[in-house]
Amino acid sequence: MEGAVVKMEKQGKVWLVGAGPSDPGLLTLKGKQLLEQAQVVVYDALVSAAILAMIPNDAELIYVGKRAGNHPVPQDQINQILLAKAQEGKRVVRLKGGDPFLFGRGGEELELLAAHHIPFEVVPGITSALAVPAYNGIPVTHRDYCSSVHIITAHSKKGGELKINFPALCALEGTLVFLMGVTSMEMGCEGLVKAGMDPQMPAAILQEGTSAVQRRVVATVSDLPQKAREANIQAPSVLIVGKVCALEKTLSWTQNRPLDGVRVVLTRPKELVSRMAYRLYELGAEVIELPAICLEPYAENPQLSKALSHISDYQWAAFTSITGVRVFFDFLRKRRCDLRALSHLRFAAIGPGTAKELEQHGI
């Protein structure tokens, strides 16, 4: 109708993103890009602090828990949160540990969105069923040992029996990977032995895999529950049963790094933390970026203004940090200063990072 104003409602969208296991380096590139653009992030307990540090400060974070035996926010309520935020027109990332479609209830969360015609995408994550054994020197398949791998949830209601066909698993002769397996480990190992598995079959329980503090206990399937109790193995853990577990001593690689087992919190400004974080990560540390410093240049800097007005009186310009270089040249740019006025100066830089920053400005 002529003269009428049509109001277009903004359409929100949900991305179901698998965060992978603990190591932030295993997050997919697409997952990282989506986190950096998110307006709302709904996340589980198993998402590492290092990954959460990638989220913009202005994004809304909604914690929904979901550890074994502890679900503070019911699944139906999580579904409603996603729907409500999308209906507000927000870019919503639903961030789940591992892969969202492997025992992650991701399908349930998307069904409600589909019913309300909310657009969504799925970004697969690296599952702990593969990454955790790999970080412990256990290949889930090996030509000389097995040609199949089978992933089973070992989660059951408190006090309930496992609904697993143990005889069928024993007949498969492949590697068995049980997720959420700590509380049900004893029932699982006993069930396999009673179903005919060799009691001397190698098995391993892997705690907090891919993190700097990961631990493992390797034994036979009959002895593993007792040895795991003695080692005080806790959730989250992955249970592996199969001949490939015998390779862990030969193929273990994470324990050889100098900072293995160390967690490091970096409090530097977010824009300066990446290089140091990468170096620590390469040495085996688990790096958590927790910026506690925010650098803001003075709106007016009378001392710098005065120095620049008498720049011909100076012979040296010395910089002690990358930030100092950036603030200085930003100050010049905003005031449209002629850089040729600096041509007589000699420049000094403390540290290679500061020197490299000067090089970016042609110095």
Predicted regions and their residues:
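A contiguous loop/helix-start segment that scaffolds small-molecule binding in enzyme catalytic cores
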Residues: 2, 11-14, 77, 87-92, ...
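Class I S-adenosyl-L-methionine
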Residues: 2-24, 29-126, 131, 230, ...
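Signature of uroporphyrinogen-III synthase
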Residues: 22, 74-78, 211-363
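A glycine- and small-aliphatic-rich helix-loop capping segment at beta-alpha/alpha-beta transitions
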Residues: 32, 108-120, 136-143, 194-195, ...
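Short gly/pro/ser/thr-enriched loop/turn and capping motifs at secondary-structure boundaries
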Residues: 49-50, 68-70, 127-131, 148-151, ...
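Beta-strand->loop->alpha-helix junctions that form or flank phosphate-binding loops
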Residues: 62-65, 124, 201-210, 288-293
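Short, conserved phosphate/pyrophosphate- and ester-handling motifs at nucleotide-, phospho-/glycolipid
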Residues: 125, 181, 351
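Short, glycine-/small-residue-rich phosphate/pyrophosphate-handling segment
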Residues: 133, 137-155, 363
